[in-house]
Amino acid sequence: MLRTLLRRRLFSYPTKYYFMVLVLSLITFSVLRIHQKPEFVSVRHLELAGENPSSDINCTKVLQGDVNEIQKVKLEILTVKFKKRPRWTPDDYINMTSDCSSFIKRRKYIVEPLSKEEAEFPIAYSIVVHHKIEMLDRLLRAIYMPQNFYCIHVDTKSEDSYLAAVMGIASCFSNVFVASRLESVVYASWSRVQADLNCMKDLYAMSANWKYLINLCGMDFPIKTNLEIVRKLKLLMGENNLETERMPSHKEERWKKRYEVVNGKLTNTGTVKMLPPLETPLFSGSAYFVVSREYVGYVLQNEKIQKLMEWAQDTYSPDEYLWATIQRIPEVPGSLPASHKYDLSDMQAVARFVKWQYFEGDVSKGAPYPPCDGVHVRSVCIFGAGDLNWMLRKHHLFANKFDVDVDLFAIQCLDEHLRHKALETLKH
């Protein structure tokens, strides 16, 4: 009797109704939980502010261009305490990456896409490095997203411990790897191009999903978030973007004469070279590019491009004309016409912001950018904290050069700013 009564009560209309509401509520809650951002993608866990607790530098003021705070940075860098601060060595990274879970958590890498838009637009990176493991870690962390792909080329002249440290970092991520073939990179020689080509081949074979390739060196740093980079790349609509201008006459000596590496340095042999095997004239540019996957495939497979590259191997600084020239060959995917009307300067292209000493000056009087706040090496500015405010208002994706040994706070403040900006998207 009691069992029959309970059965009638349980399966009566009101009870069945409330039971169904409960089940549907639980299902809805579960679905919402699945599509929520994981718990670790929280602002508190991934924010980088306060990573250097021993310093009282206010990065917000630095980024605003506050003269007093920037002067404070300069004084801090000169202190004995700062100069004797603990530094991470390759051996430290080898030890840290022996426990990948701990390393990723400690270094606050982002291991989930921050948006659907970013997840659906993977980017490939070629990173050429030879020293300063902490710089590589900071760069990789700043650009790392699980949907992207990262090839790291390590100079064969690098110390064994450095290579081991890079391999340790790469081992902690399924989408980060060391190039399958490594070169001994000599300044201004073909080996710099070959390093990027090696990564191009590996990345092209690794995945057909990535949309664009961006090449970097170990002293680059982003000045845009991953989402901002994705949106700028989408606006290109398949076109490549890199510096490509008419070849100035003073640079013609670089490819009209034959060069070879002698005792680790590139030397002019004085031998006159044959003209390039190309109808398109040679164009001047830089080592840095933002190119589509279709461009990469064409470069790797096209016979005409292969002949051009073979011809260029004994020239001076081929990276500063090769990519710029390929970008003006008509049949290359995403290329520009050879007419000078389509020339792009380094300030018009988005690939890289670089300050050259001989162009610095008063912007109000026609200079392209203000004086360097850091130091100069080979006429290139190694940025200081005072360079950030102006730089962040430019359209470029990356800037070169940064160095933890010149101005750590320039990198730290930029790093904090980009991470906070990226995490802000989670609130909307």
Curated annotation (Swiss-Prot):
Molecular function per GO: beta-1,3-galactosyl-O-glycosyl-glycoprotein beta-1,6-N-acetylglucosaminyltransferase activity
Binding site residues for UDP-N-acetyl-alpha-D-glucosamine: 128-130, 155-157, 187, 378, 401
Region (Catalytic): 122-428
Disulphide bridges, residue numbers: 59-413, 100-172, 151-199, 372-381
Active-site residues, Swiss-Prot/TrEMBL: 320
Subcellular location: Golgi apparatus membrane
Top class in the EC scheme: transferase
Organism superkingdom: Eukaryota
Pathway(s) annotated for this protein in UniProt: Protein modification; protein glycosylation; Glycolipid biosynthesis
Protein name: Beta-1,3-galactosyl-O-glycosyl-glycoprotein beta-1,6-N-acetylglucosaminyltransferase
